[in-house]
């Protein structure tokens, strides 16, 4: 009989808050979301994807930059996006990214990411309400929700999107 003693590290996850990014500015439309977050996105010369987590009242809980890419693409890991939503105890989320090239039209990869994130959110019970693309150097945006391009599985959430209140308390 062996007297081997096993030592296991106990691990824990803690939410560490950084500087406040959301103010009391009321944001109800994709243009307002982009306008508010554009100051953050303007700092980058490459594609940046962020996630805005929402609570049960559809108010923002937080915002996290979950991917930084190259000039023409950002690798959006569903794991990183959903980790932010789960750790924030979010009831839903919006993803937003910029297109430094100046066009807000979604690429095939953007459409794929929207579909994957919609399915991941549905599986975890944290719905994706919108994916917004902001073109650099202009006010041009593309909202998958407003264009009716959200995946079919998300249509059951569509009635709640109009109630999203992107204003912090």
Where are these regions (language model features)?
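A cross-taxonomic marker for long C-terminal extensions/tails that follow the last structured domain
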Residues: 162-169
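Short loop/turn microsegments at loop-to-beta-strand junctions
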Residues: 48-49, 129
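Active-site-proximal loop/helix of nucleotide/amide-processing enzymes and allied scaffolds
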Residues: 1-15, 19-23, 32-35, 55-57, ...
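Short loop/turn motifs at secondary-structure junctions and domain boundaries
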Residues: 42-45
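Extended substrate/RNA-proximal surfaces in nucleic-acid metabolism proteins
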Residues: 28
């Amino acid at each position: 009989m062996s007297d081997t003693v096993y030592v296991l590290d106990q691990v824990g996850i803690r939410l560490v808050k950084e500087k406040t990014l959301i103010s009391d500015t009321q944001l109800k439309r994709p243009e307002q979301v982009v306008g508010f977050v554009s100051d953050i996105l303007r700092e980058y010369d490459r594609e940046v994807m962020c996630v805005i987590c929402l609570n049960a009242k559809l108010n923002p809980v937080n915002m996290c930059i979950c991917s930084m890419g190259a000039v023409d693409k950002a690798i959006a890991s569903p794991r990183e996006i959903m980790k932010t939503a789960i750790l924030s105890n979010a009831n839903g989320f919006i993803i937003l990214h910029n297109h430094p090239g100046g066009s807000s039209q979604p690429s095939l990869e953007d459409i794929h990411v929207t579909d994957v994130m919609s399915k991941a959110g549905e599986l975890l019970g944290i719905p994706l309400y919108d994916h917004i693309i902001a073109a650099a150097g202009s006010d041009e945006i593309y909202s998958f929700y407003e264009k009716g391009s959200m995946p079919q599985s998300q249509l059951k959430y569509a009635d709640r999107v109009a109630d999203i209140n992107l204003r912090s308390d």
